[in-house]
Amino acid sequence: MTITQPANAHLFRSLHTPAAPLALANAWDVASARVIEAAGAPAIATTSAGVAWSLGSPDGDILTRERALKLVARIVAAVAVPVTADIEGGYGKDAADVAETVAGVLAAGAVGVNIEDGTRPAAELASRLAAARQSADRAGADLFLNARIDTFLLGLGDPDTRLKETLARAHLYVEAGADGIFVPGVTDTATIEALARDISVPLNVMAGPGTPRVAELGALGVARVSLGSGVAQAAYAAARRAAQDLFGTGGYDSLAEGIAFPELNALLSGPR
């Protein structure tokens, strides 16, 4: 653990409240983390998709643990606010691998992780979560363990019973040691409210165009709002627009909204 890790862990945990939901604009490298921190972020969350893309890999448990953790360590060293890492399914084939990944995350100085179930059976993710919790306990670390349920995001199972299945998974994951439940892919207020009402730990949703604003989500009981890979996608879209402008019309107008060179350079030059 780093010297600042216990204080950052306590701060990060305290930020999860529906009265003022924790808003996370997910970063994928040091520069994006510094820009997001300078914009007023109380914490930095990584996006596994954005990290993978920036390192030349597709998302989906393809990136190696070593490369992912090196990036987490660099981000932690570059910012003053707490950092939580998206570690996909745990970067490994079994619970023991997940425990090793979590030990690496803690060694990097992060104070939280996201672990997703994807298409795995609920019991398998519960085992991975329990291993993650035990790994943190062995290190004497206060790790915020956020369990991601992909039933809505991936459209898994019968739509008529999807909410019931999601809640069953949430309860199982909390019993396994999860401190928070992340349900991406949900945008309608009735479902969000039902999730918040029936889940005993802080609820995290993923936001984007069409999602209620942060304050509205808080009123529904949401304690944490993430943009996921959205900021990275927007950044790459800006790069594509600039290239299409240049190669299509020979123009440069799409560069007008860029961050000024001195400002960006200063963010990466001074002390954190």
Explain the meaning of each model-derived region.
Residues 255-272:
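A short, charged, Gly/Pro-tolerant segment at domain boundaries
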Residues 3-227, 233-245:
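Alpha/beta enzyme core
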Residues 244-255:
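Short, highly charge-biased, low-complexity peptide segments
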